[in-house]
């Protein structure tokens, strides 16, 4: 079976080409276009050529007078020509930014400006080869479906043929669009054309739809002055009267004024004034936005120098609202100061009312903490006359425990805390009486001891304690020992018992204790002792003559616990004084011999309680 194609009538019919161009234009603009094409694609020329396609029958499914269905193999290598016109984007950065999310783009101004160039593309030397399913019916028209991609090759000629990479890019993009056209859009175009040729009902329906969608421009036009706004103004903001509106017409030779509603004009003016982004005297520059003015000072320096009372400045608007609010109470001053940096409420009076309520409700809760009272029901011993007589000495010993807390805690496992008198508040004792009393008495006791020592001060002074001992007392400037004192200490390291009362070692001015001789009683040494060991006392010193009588009187007059506590404190004080004296004497003697450092000496253990 053979078919004879009559290709010449298609070329002779001018109406066919017009309808085909319109359908192709609609099809090319319907599909998603690449971002480089920024204008509509218009088909300006369409010519099917003189060479018809070649068809090979593969299968016939249905054959009748008014219908036909078959599968063909089509081959076309004719002289058809298709010319398109559009506009393309020549700036690749603009194309890149259009295809990306605005959050990830750097938002350039000048570099991303579009550069539109007109483009004319001519498609020729089209070669097609594929399998076609053809269905014909007088009632339903012709349906052509391609089972595979029919496009083999195509020649693209454009205005950018002199630029190789642009030519290759256009070639690839147009081939991709034509493949979509043959597979999706071309069957629909052929079907609509066949319905126009053979179905009169469809042609009448399509004509009616065109009249509805594209109404004719013939006839009188609509007069915009027929229904003017209620409060019209001209372009300068002047209100127009009814007579002036009636004098205006579309056919008048006078210049046409733009009519605006006065309410809308005021809203637009307020919006423009509040933003302050452009000045009226600034020349218009494309793709440029000026920054907003930051305050009234910059507004006054601007070209106009006018500030509209209708709209406050753009910056710190809430601050102006807060300043204009009503005066608040004294409790709300802190709240008002902190609220000036936050957005204010719509009503200044209401904001002050809310602040005063909040401040009054929470002012008492945060003013002071509630005092927790603890009632002490334990029995307290009343001070006796003997204890009252030696109150000065007991206060001295109370202060010494604070200075020797660290050393005493490491040597003795138990400590006895003296009782205190709470005469100020007998019902509510303080939380920590020992700590508070020591803090209060420390400075006063030191001054008392310094005054007591000033009366007994002699001219003999020793050098300051080395820094390696880590004493907490501030050192006063001291004078070096005389040479005769140093020689006497070196030659007689162990004084006789009868001379122990007259011997006084070098004193430390800043220690809060009295002068206590550090050389205890002991038998005289038969052999001379080295200078490095001359400052160390024997292991078991006697405390009867090494402590002031005041300590012993307190111990005899007090109870057993007080006596034990006093003896413990006295032994601790004696140990510290002996260490200080031995370090001072060793530093002077060892400096001449070159031996006897701090780490070379061994400290004696603290003495035990006296039995």
Swiss-Prot record:
What is this protein's function?
Component of the ERMES/MDM complex, which serves as a molecular tether to connect the endoplasmic reticulum (ER) and mitochondria. Components of this complex are involved in the control of mitochondrial shape and protein biogenesis, and function in nonvesicular lipid trafficking between the ER and mitochondria. MDM34 is required for the interaction of the ER-resident membrane protein MMM1 and the outer mitochondrial membrane-resident beta-barrel protein MDM10.
Biased composition (Polar residues) is annotated at 325-342
Subcellular compartments: Mitochondrion outer membrane
Q: Where is the composition biased (Basic residues)?
A: 361-373
| Alphabetically ordered keywords of this record | Lipid transport, Lipid-binding, Membrane, Mitochondrion, Mitochondrion outer membrane, Transmembrane, Transmembrane beta strand, Transport
What is the membrane topology here? Multi-pass membrane protein
Gene Ontology cellular component annotations, sorted alphabetically = ERMES complex
Q: Where do the SMP-LTD domain residues begin and end?
A: 1-195
- Organism in which the protein naturally occurs: Paracoccidioides brasiliensis (strain Pb18)
Lineage, uppermost ranks: Eukaryota, Fungi, Dikarya, Ascomycota, Pezizomycotina
Question: Could you tell me one molecular function GO term of this UniProt entry?
Answer: lipid binding
Specify whether Amino-acid biosynthesis is a keyword of the entry: no
Q: What is this protein called?
A: Mitochondrial distribution and morphology protein 34
């Amino acid at each position: 079976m053979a078919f004879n194609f009559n290709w010449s009538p298609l070329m002779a019919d001018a109406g066919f080409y017009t309808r085909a161009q319109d359908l192709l234009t609609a099809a090319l603009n319907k599909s998603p276009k690449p971002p480089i094409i920024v204008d509509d694609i218009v088909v300006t020329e369409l010519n099917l050529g003189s060479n018809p396609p070649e068809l090979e029958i593969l299968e016939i499914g249905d054959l009748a007078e008014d219908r036909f269905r078959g599968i063909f193999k089509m081959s076309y290598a004719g002289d058809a020509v298709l010319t398109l016109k559009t506009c393309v984007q020549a700036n690749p950065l603009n194309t890149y930014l259009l295809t990306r999310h605005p959050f990830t783009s750097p938002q350039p101004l000048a570099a991303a400006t579009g550069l539109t160039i007109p483009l004319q593309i001519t498609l020729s030397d089209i070669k097609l080869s594929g399998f076609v399913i053809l269905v014909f019916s007088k009632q339903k028209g012709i349906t052509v479906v391609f089972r595979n991609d029919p496009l083999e090759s195509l020649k693209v000629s454009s205005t950018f043929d002199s630029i190789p990479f642009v030519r290759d890019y256009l070639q690839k993009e147009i081939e991709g669009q034509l493949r979509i056209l043959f597979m999706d859009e071309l069957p629909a175009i052929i079907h609509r054309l066949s319905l126009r040729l053979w179905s009169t009902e469809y042609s009448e329906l399509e004509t009616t739809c065109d009249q509805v969608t594209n109404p004719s421009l013939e006839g009188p036009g609509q007069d915009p002055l027929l229904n003017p706004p209620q409060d019209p103004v001209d372009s300068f903001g002047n209100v127009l009267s009814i007579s002036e509106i009636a004098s205006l017409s579309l056919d008048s030779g006078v210049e046409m004024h733009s009519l605006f509603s006065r309410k809308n004009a005021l809203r637009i003016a307020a919006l423009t004034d509040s933003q302050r982004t452009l000045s009226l005297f600034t020349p218009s520059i494309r793709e440029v936005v000026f920054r907003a003015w930051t305050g009234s000072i910059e507004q006054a320096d601007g070209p106009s120098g006018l500030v509209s009372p209708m709209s406050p400045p753009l910056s710190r608007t809430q601050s102006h609202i807060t300043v204009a609010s009503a005066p608040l109470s004294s409790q709300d001053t802190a709240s008002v100061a902190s609220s000036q940096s936050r957005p204010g409420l719509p009503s200044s009076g209401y904001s002050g009312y809310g602040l005063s309520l909040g401040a009054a409700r929470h002012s008492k809760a945060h003013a002071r903490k509630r005092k927790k009272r603890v009632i002490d029901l334990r029995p307290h011993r009343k001070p006796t006359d003997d204890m009252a007589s030696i109150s000065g000495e007991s206060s001295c010993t109370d202060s010494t425990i604070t200075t020797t807390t660290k050393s005493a805690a490491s040597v003795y496992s138990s400590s006895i805390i003296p009782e205190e008198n709470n005469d100020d508040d007998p019902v509510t004792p303080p939380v920590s009486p020992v700590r508070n009393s020591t803090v209060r008495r420390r400075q006063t006791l030191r001054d008392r001891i310094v005054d007591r020592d000033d009366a007994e001060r002699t001219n003999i002074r020793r050098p300051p304690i080395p820094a390696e001992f880590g004493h907490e007392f501030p050192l006063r400037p001291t004078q070096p020992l005389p040479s005769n004192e140093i020689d006497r200490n070196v030659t007689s390291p162990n004084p006789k018992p009868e001379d122990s009362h007259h011997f006084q070692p070098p004193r430390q001015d800043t220690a809060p204790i009295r002068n206590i001789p550090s050389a205890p009683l002991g038998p005289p040494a038969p052999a001379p002792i080295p200078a490095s060991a001359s400052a160390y006392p024997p292991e078991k010193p006697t405390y009867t003559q090494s402590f002031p009588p005041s300590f012993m009187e307190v111990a005899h007059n007090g109870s057993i616990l007080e006596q034990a506590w006093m003896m413990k404190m006295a032994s601790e004080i004696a140990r510290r004084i002996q260490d200080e004296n031995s370090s001072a004497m060793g530093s002077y003697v060892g400096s001449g011999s070159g031996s006897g450092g701090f780490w070379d000496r061994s400290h004696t253990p603290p003495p035990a309680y006296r039995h």
